[in-house]
């Protein structure tokens, strides 16, 4: 015979087991509350494979766990979701295994939109009206960040997932965790302070991250204070709150929304293929620039050669200028090669961390070969121009008056240094200078016959 649940314990201090206590409590609750209607807001909705539905029904001050078994869940037409306001009919009971007080529901009816959803939509409309969601405000993420701040909880899988992605894709990126609570009463204030602190550290980008959870668990990211802190950040920020189906106010305000924290890391981790493509582009630009510079210098040297019209000092000046151009061109090549080589070394270091392997080695060999060939080509061109100049100098020397003097001829000059070309330009007794190949003679005109003189071609 079953004990009366309302029977008080005797004065002899009857001792109950935990199972007996929970059983009596369950019978008492089911007897007093065989059927009740309760209105509240759904949260922590769970649908296991059994077909049963478990959820929490709450208002602003309290909450109760509820169970809707499969045969009753099939009759519910309304799609249940977190934040939905409903009216639930059922009996109050107690799950003896855990001692949990609960409502066994048999009917669930909608009671209008939940308070959290209404608050979400109201804040979303307000901030959108202020332009905080506008695309013009969105800043692009850096293509190759060096330092990234992560605003998240220091414990849990989120930070481990983010670190794992960066170790795999971009181990050279420096990650800094700015710890904060992401759930609970203190979460909003801590998140705001963490964002303000991170924004002052000079990071290239920020990740605001949290794992999945119920609407209540994620609610701090729907608070106005957090949204305005995100909007105030001068640093580009990626919001990665919850799972792919979760959407928060911070997602709308941030520069980029990522469906998961791992996806946020993928967005900011440089891709090895992009770096390889950039290296190829730099190599092509280097080759084209060197060719262009070599062509300009060659044209310049040709112009110098065309302007060489006079012997002697003019020729020496141009030869000196050619030497100067040679040295400047060499220095320019060496300087450009040093700058490009240093830049390539930096890129190679970054690529080496991502194991590009044999492709990078082959590219480096090819680039070294090009770098070695360019100076040799420049030296060959300069050598050819120098030989042409020497040939011109020899030609000019052949037709030079000084060469004529060297064959035994002389040049007569009057007192003013003017050359005497005709005997009629002189007077008997006039003193003249005779310039020879080596030295000068003082001579005097004895007579000035204007008889034509025939010179031997063999002289």
Swiss-Prot record:
Transmembrane segments: none
GO CC annotation: cytoplasm; exodeoxyribonuclease VII complex
Source species, domain of life: Bacteria
Top-rank EC class of the record's enzyme: hydrolase
The protein's Enzyme Commission number: 3.1.11.6
One BP annotation, GO: DNA catabolic process
Protein name as annotated: Exodeoxyribonuclease 7 large subunit
Organism of origin: Pseudomonas aeruginosa (strain ATCC 15692 / DSM 22644 / CIP 104116 / JCM 14847 / LMG 12228 / 1C / PRS 101 / PAO1)
């Amino acid at each position: 015979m079953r004990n009366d649940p309302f029977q008080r314990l005797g004065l002899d201090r009857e001792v109950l087991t935990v199972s007996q206590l929970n059983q009596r409590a369950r019978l008492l609750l089911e007897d007093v509350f065989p059927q009740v209607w309760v209105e509240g807001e759904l949260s922590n909705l769970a649908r296991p494979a059994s077909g049963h539905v478990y959820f929490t029904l709450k208002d602003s001050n309290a909450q109760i766990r509820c169970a809707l078994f499969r045969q009753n869940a099939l009759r519910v037409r309304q799609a249940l979701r977190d934040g939905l306001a409903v009216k639930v009919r059922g009996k109050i009971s107690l799950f003896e295994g855990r001692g949990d007080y609960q409502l066994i529901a048999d009917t669930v009816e909608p009671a209008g939109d939940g308070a959290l959803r209404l608050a979400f939509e109201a804040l979303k409309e307000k901030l959108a009206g202020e332009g905080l969601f506008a695309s013009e405000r969105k800043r692009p993420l850096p293509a190759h960040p060096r330092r990234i701040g992560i605003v998240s909880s220091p414990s849990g899988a989120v930070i481990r997932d983010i670190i794992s992605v960066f170790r795999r894709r971009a181990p050279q990126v420096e990650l800094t965790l700015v710890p904060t609570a992401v759930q609970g009463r203190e979460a909003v204030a801590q998140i705001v302070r963490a964002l303000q602190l991170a924004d002052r550290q000079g990071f290239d980008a920020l990740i605001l991250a949290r794992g999945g959870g119920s609407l209540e668990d994620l609610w701090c990211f729907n608070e106005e204070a957090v949204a305005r802190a995100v909007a105030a950040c001068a640093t580009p920020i990626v919001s990665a709150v919850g799972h792919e189906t979760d959407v928060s106010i911070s997602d709308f305000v941030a520069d980029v929304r990522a469906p998961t924290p791992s996806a946020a890391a993928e967005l900011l981790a440089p891709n090895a293929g992009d770096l390889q493509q950039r290296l190829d582009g730099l190599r092509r630009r280097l080759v084209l620039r060197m060719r262009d510079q070599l062509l300009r210098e060659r044209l310049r040297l040709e112009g110098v050669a065309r302007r060489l019209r006079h012997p002697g000092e003019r020729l020496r000046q141009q030869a000196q200028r050619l030497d100067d151009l040679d040295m400047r061109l060499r220095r320019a090549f060496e300087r450009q090669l040093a700058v490009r080589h240093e830049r390539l070394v930096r890129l190679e270091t970054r690529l080496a961390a991502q194991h590009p392997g044999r492709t990078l080695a082959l590219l480096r060999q090819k680039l070294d070969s090009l770098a070695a060939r360019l100076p040799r080509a420049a030296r060959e061109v300069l050598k050819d121009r120098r030989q042409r100049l020497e040939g011109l100098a020899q030609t000019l020397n052949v037709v030079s008056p000084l060469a004529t003097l060297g064959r035994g001829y002389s040049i007569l000059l009057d007192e003013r240094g003017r050359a005497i070309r005709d005997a009629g330009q002189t007077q008997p007794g006039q003193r003249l200078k005779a310039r020879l190949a080596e030295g000068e003679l003082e001579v005097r005109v004895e007579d000035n016959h204007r008889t034509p003189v025939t010179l031997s071609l063999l002289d």
